């Protein structure tokens, strides 16, 4: 055996130098230890609660007992900890630990805003959110209050003596994106609405523009946020900061503005105070939908009185972390931006919903499964009472259509007999499909329901806004037929009033905003036909058919007097971009071709604020008022004719001046031309006596005719 002496003084030293830096990371050396390092995910079940009573050390046990009872109503397994003050009392905050992240999320929603007693209200936040809070910057200063920006009369455009409407367009002018606001001039080219330098601007928006619902403001989108323009000079009225915003939406009464970033890393829909610019609420996209991106926009849908807004509830997950179908609607109060009754409304398999145009009533549709039929119905808010519902089996597709008056709601359903799944995952319906329109009459007792079966496939539907008629477009692309129905009192089914001539490629019907007139559109088709139909008669009558090949958009103006067809970017390739304006009867008034036309939007009008008595008075004197406008139109035509005649006279007078000046110059230089031509005056008038009349006969056509034989020829 060899003896080793560890105490040798001359043993070689293997230590690292003092300035040595190891390039091997801890992830390589000790991955098993780092795996156990606490992460922020471990605190997902922890909730921080502020607003608890501040008590002394002698009352801590009593406070802890009371808080435990309150929290155990939500989850028996909750653990609590009250951070002590230096004296042993409470600091007014509470740390809680819940079994999992779901129960913690439920606790946050339930406890945030909870009234513990008359003097204490809880404020609950995830502990992970508290960890993300940063200290205020040292350079932070108190914001300076901005001065009020007076842009003038926001409704100046409504005071036009001829009641003319305005519209805005976005197109390229000399290769530069330009937005302009125009006044529609009946029978003449549109004119810029106001100062030409202010009503039309290059690069006014970086993406798109939008009118506010009442037409008070024109909104433009920029990289740093949204700007609202108003007044006669289109001055900047408001600015809302939201970097890289892509989508915006107004509440019905112009009180709130919803914004969304879209396909960016930070995806947060926000709701802003429209007139103050104050950020009211910012929502987490993942919290709202369970996804990193919103499925549709506008995501929030507002009630007409702006008291509530709603969205589909985020889908939950089962024990295997598989996403379930959406089973409810989240309805928020605009005053507090919190859920009504602190919870969502449960509706299994809900697909979509929509608010009534006149009342806080929600219409919803939940799709069917193999075991559960489809359901469509009406929900009263905030009582959450279901006014009426109906269930139908084997529904493949459904759509809903509210009448503008809010009196009726139509549901279209396509029902199949049997379905099969192909290898590609595509669904095939076997045995044909049936098409139905179910109509809820909201103003009737217990909300009556009537059914209308359709003999042909459904294409589109629209209501007469204030009347009792509607139009259903049925058929296919080769033959589409508009059918007009009427709902009569005490009737159990709609009555077919007119079945109009079928057309090719019709795909949409639109009633005028004031009713009576109907447009049937064949958008994005080579023919580009539009039927104009008068439905105010006992039997609907087609008044005109117009053509605008490949147009992809059509709109009524807010008054229902004019209809525009547009070919814009994003339509069918090869279309001539531009717009055409027609009367409600289909007579063309204006045609404009524009380079890279992107948008055409009529300026909305605010709701009528007149009393019922005043409206009846206007209807009573409508003939006199109409005669006045007819006279103004005739005078304008005469004035236009006189202007044309006067313009022609001025042009002729200017031409005579030029002609006389040139004739005088020609006469003064005549002797020079005679000298150049060896004394021959080629410009002198010829003597008529030197002319000789000569007639020349020209045969225009010839023919061969057999001559009769003479007597001698006959004898020979």
Swiss-Prot record:
The record's family statement is: Belongs to the eIF-3 subunit B family.
Drop me one GO molecular function for this one.
Answer: translation initiation factor activity
Q: Name one Pfam family in it.
A: eIF2A
List GO terms (cellular component aspect). Answer: eukaryotic 43S preinitiation complex; eukaryotic 48S preinitiation complex; eukaryotic translation initiation factor 3 complex
**Which GO BP terms apply?**
formation of cytoplasmic translation initiation complex; regulation of translational initiation; translational initiation
Top-rank lineage group of the source organism: Eukaryota
UniProtKB keywords: Cytoplasm, Initiation factor, Protein biosynthesis, Repeat, RNA-binding, WD repeat
Please state what the protein is called: Eukaryotic translation initiation factor 3 subunit B
Q: Where are the WD repeats?
A: 195-233, 235-283, 345-386, 411-450, 453-495, 501-543, 545-585
Reply yes or no: does the keyword Repeat apply: yes
Q: Where is the RRM domain?
A: 45-129
Localization (cell): Cytoplasm
The function of this protein is:
RNA-binding component of the eukaryotic translation initiation factor 3 (eIF-3) complex, which is involved in protein synthesis of a specialized repertoire of mRNAs and, together with other initiation factors, stimulates binding of mRNA and methionyl-tRNAi to the 40S ribosome. The eIF-3 complex specifically targets and initiates translation of a subset of mRNAs involved in cell proliferation.
Q: What is its main location?
A: cytoplasm
**SUPFAM superfamilies in the record, alphabetically?**
DPP6 N-terminal domain-like
The annotated subunit structure for this chain is:
Component of the eukaryotic translation initiation factor 3 (eIF-3) complex.
Keyword Oxidoreductase attributed:
no
Q: Source species, please?
A: Caenorhabditis briggsae
